[in-house]
A protein has these predicted regions:
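Hydrophobic transmembrane alpha-helices
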Residues: 1-27, 31
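Alpha-helical transmembrane segments in multi-pass membrane proteins
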Residues: 5, 9, 24-25, 46, ...
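Transmembrane helix-loop junction
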Residues: 14-15, 34, 55, 59, ...
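Central hydrophobic cores of alpha-helical transmembrane segments
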Residues: 21-30, 67-79
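Membrane-embedded alpha-helical hairpins and interfacial helices in multi-pass inner-membrane proteins
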Residues: 69-144
Length: 148
């Protein structure tokens, strides 16, 4: 998501450089997911927290500058992904059992947990951050002519 939607992020940064714009963007996105039945508290907390931090970074360092855009979008994507990782990292047994109770197999859950912790967890964080950063750089290249 971070790679593909980096263009949208850059477009908003260029054309609507207002404090709180990405916090509002995140809240609207979360509301849509809530209406579809896919939201839960850790995801809300981590997503909104990182959106607030991204808004602060952009308002202090500039909405049209590359480094603040790259850092902010990476933080927002990590915040969104952390909503998925937090239950696994801190409540592994409960997370596993809840999903088994919902019909997932124990083997599937064990594989999911394996790839969310330890070295694979670190790799996941790096991949999400890297793809988000690349998404912003692509967005800046594509939307250069639309910059106000």
């Amino acid at each position: 998501f971070g790679l593909l939607s980096g263009i949208i992020f850059v477009y908003i940064s260029y054309n609507y450089p207002r404090k709180g714009i990405f916090t509002i963007y995140t809240i609207v996105l979360l509301l849509f997911f809530t209406l579809m039945g896919g939201a839960y508290l850790p995801w809300f907390i981590s997503s909104i927290s990182m959106a607030i931090l991204a808004d602060i970074i952009l308002s202090v360092f500039g909405y049209d500058r590359a480094i603040p855009q790259v850092a902010s979008w990476a933080l927002m994507q990590l915040g969104s992904a952390a909503g998925q990782w937090i239950p696994i990292w801190f409540f592994t047994d409960r997370f596993r059992q809840d999903w088994i109770d919902k019909g997932q197999s124990a083997a599937t859950m064990d594989a999911m947990i394996h790839y969310a912790v330890g070295i694979w967890g670190i790799i996941s964080v790096l991949v999400v951050a890297s793809l988000s950063m690349i998404g912003v750089l692509i967005g800046r290249k594509v939307l250069k002519k639309y910059k106000k």
